[in-house]
Amino acid sequence: MVKYQSTRGHKETISFEDVILSGLAPDKGLYLPDSLTIDNLNHLTEEDLSYEDFVKTIFIALDKNSAKYVDDLSLYSGFEHSAEPVLKDLNDTTLIMELFHGPTKSFKDYALQPLGAIADKRLSELGERGLVLVATSGDTGSAAIQAVKESENIDIVVLHPADKISDYQRQQMTSVIKDNVFNIAVNGSYDDCQRIAKEILSDNPFERRIISLNSINWLRVMGQVSYYVWLTKQFTSPINVAIPSGNFGNAYSAWFGRSHGLKINQIMCTTNVNDVLKRFTDTGTLEPLITKPSVAPSLSLIHISEPTRPERIAYGGLWLK
């Protein structure tokens, strides 16, 4: 049985059922699975299934306890067409994996649609109503809202930095008129939104369960690992991947897949002027700075100066490997 432990050494481990609805660990660390219990993922590239069934197979490979949650669920009901990613040629040696065919045109639909469905099912089991708290630089918020807006067991509060996301993303979030959806514009940066969310998640002041759908939640990683397994399935030789990176959740998912057998050589994180990730990979030191404005507002997801997800890869010095 896979157990989940904190990156900061908290001794108590939790189960898959607990990690579904988890935020931060009691010591404010991020949860990680005991990787020794996870099989090599490369053999899954031989599966010939629909993308949704393929993702279910990967979830079960990552944790067999997920089977009772994914087997009879529609993980991609929000997609108008197949959720299978699309590959387009850029030139003779480079392809683009298109992950913008979901309901919000964000790659985060691919992980949040399954997570929303699984979290709703788990809350129904418990007879509880949960509160999802999300900090967003634009894309997570709209994708999270779409994932849970029809939920019978979830309310969602989204924190976004005022005037620092694209107008398209703002309209996506604020035009959803549902009794369980709440949007709050924060006077500050995404890092400020993330700080507020982490403080609430680590010291819950409310008398109800608070859930994170940010990549703090391990199931987000599982959903993202799934499309890297699918991607390597399309090639006979190892590949390199280049990923626009802000909080490092997506790039970490590629690294996790590689560390569990996927044929990925280089993982290249691309940043803008907020280059804390570049400095981290160059020096091994994670040194947050003040967020600087960029000329690419549509890429607000990389306007981040205090990424928290590198903590998973730094755990135990694993970033060196």
Regions found by a protein language model. Give the residues of each.
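Single conserved hydrophobic/aromatic residue that forms the stacking wall/gate
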Residues: 302-321
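Small-residue-rich anion-binding loops in enzyme active sites
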Residues: 26-105, 177-206
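Active-site nucleophile and cofactor-binding loops and adjacent substrate-binding regions
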Residues: 105-107, 131-139, 187, 213-221, ...
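Short beta-alpha connecting loops at secondary-structure transitions
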Residues: 290-298
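Well-ordered mid-protein domain cores that form the structural environment of catalytic cofactors
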Residues: 96-150
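Active-site-proximal loop->helix
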Residues: 142-184, 276-288
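Domain-scale recognition of functional cores that engage charged ligands
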Residues: 195-199, 207-258, 262
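Charged, compositionally biased N-terminal leader segments and the immediate start
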Residues: 1-27, 292-293
